[in-house]
Amino acid sequence: MLNRKTSHFLGMRVQSELEHLSELRREAGKDRSSVHGSAARTRASVRTQWTTAAAAKADEDPGANLFPPPLPRPRICMWKYLDVHSMHQLEKTTNAEMREVLAELLELGCPEQSLRDAITLDLFCHALIFCRQQGFSLEQTSAACALLQDLHKACIATPLGNVEECYRYFTSVLFCHGVRRPPFSIDLFKEEQLLALEDYVVNTYFRHFKLYKYVFTPQVRLDLSLTYMGLQPPKLWPESETEKEESKEMEEQAVTPQKEELETVAPPEPEPSHIHVLRAYIKTQVNKELEQLQGLVEERLKASEERLSSKLTALERPFQLPPGKGKSKTK
């Protein structure tokens, strides 16, 4: 009877302990999931903060975007910027009315106030006039303007020189509209039209490539700094109180030159030891090179003097006839 009661009691106790362990495991799993979720949220927030900070830094620092982005893949650009309705509007206008309609279609602000907008408008106006002179269709004119605009974007993507990359990109896009190979390229232009369009872009845009880059890209300056291995950079000596007082006295003398004051000369600043050693080394090397050059010059001067003296002695000798020719025949 006791054994049955004890076994029942032990079974109930083990069951309660198992239930307690399962509850602890559930709570631990919840805590772990919450910890992982918070960690993921913190990582996401840190990533977003880092990306926003990097973007802000790139916007503030003009040198962050110094290197050019990769050029896009050459693709068919028909109806890319000027669609069918836009081309019909331009077709109805004359050369004088074209500027206003084109400024509205390209969403240019005020060409009279903005130099860049005026240059862009002139670029596309002359391109449209060229297309009219060549007798291009609406599709060909739209593709030519889109090709020129993509080339202009590739040019102004960086302030550095990328004329070779832009020319390769231009020829690749040009061939996308001259060879029938769908969906990669179409035969929109004939061979003569392709050659005429290439000559026009080369003689107009690529001829003034640096001018477009100068106007549409920020100015970049490259500063050169030299550092010597094994030497620390020179430290700026702090101004002492005597130097501050002397500067004040000099200012007072400039304001009131009639008052006589004692002139004080600031003691020369002691040079650091490593700079003195470097200057001494440079002086010795320069003196050695100068001595070698002086010796070479003296040797060449001596050799030239000897050659001149030998020539002079040869000229000063009396002219002697060869034997047999100077004797007269006796009868």
UniProtKB/Swiss-Prot annotation:
Pfam families: CLAMP (PF14769). It comes from the Eukaryota. It is found in: Cell projection, Cilium, Flagellum; Cytoplasmic vesicle, Secretory vesicle, Acrosome; Cytoplasm. Keywords: Cell projection, Cilium, Coiled coil, Cytoplasm, Cytoplasmic vesicle, Flagellum, Phosphoprotein. Residues 236-271, 309-331 are annotated as: Disordered. Residues 286-317 form a coiled coil. GO terms for cellular component: acrosomal vesicle; cytoplasm; radial spoke; sperm principal piece. This is Cilia- and flagella-associated protein 119.
